[in-house]
Amino acid sequence: VCWDTFDAVILSSGVRDLIPRKYNSLSGGEKQRVQFARALLQLHSNGNELAGKYMLLDEPTSSLDIAHSLQLLSLTKQTTAHGLGSVVVLHDLNLAARFADNVILMHRGRIVRLGNVEHVFDDEALSEVYATKIIAERHEVLDRLVIYA
């Protein structure tokens, strides 16, 4: 990995301040951020070409506060501009609606619906999966889908 790539990943993933610290002294969220940066660096290790590569992230925001969750998902979304594909498992429907291009809604290990956010996250499908009334509507000010019970 060239130093420019290293610096870009370290800065964009927000782990620069964690470099001097021992891994065992980091919190769960800090470890999560370091692992994400490490994954990006490993993807870059065979050159700068990310096209055709994929990153699987299973609940990458589980130990993160909202600011770091937004930062990590924004960076994940930005990497798609460089050809890197991502499969992200999230249980936070609003984060999925905000950052996903396509969504797979699953229930008990089966795919219930597959497609873009507007198609997958409709009131009927969500209410059926979660067995409670779920409302998904476009927020006029935010100009994105917002989901609530």
State where each predicted segment sits.
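H-loop/switch region of ABC-family ATPase nucleotide-binding domains
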Residues: 90-91
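Catalytic Walker B motif of ABC-type/P-loop ATPase nucleotide-binding domains
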Residues: 49-50, 55-59
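Conserved ABC ATPase signature
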Residues: 22-26, 30
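Conserved ABC ATPase "signature" region
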Residues: 2-18
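Helical segment within the ABC ATPase nucleotide-binding domain
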Residues: 45, 69-82
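ABC ATPase nucleotide-binding domains
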Residues: 127-149
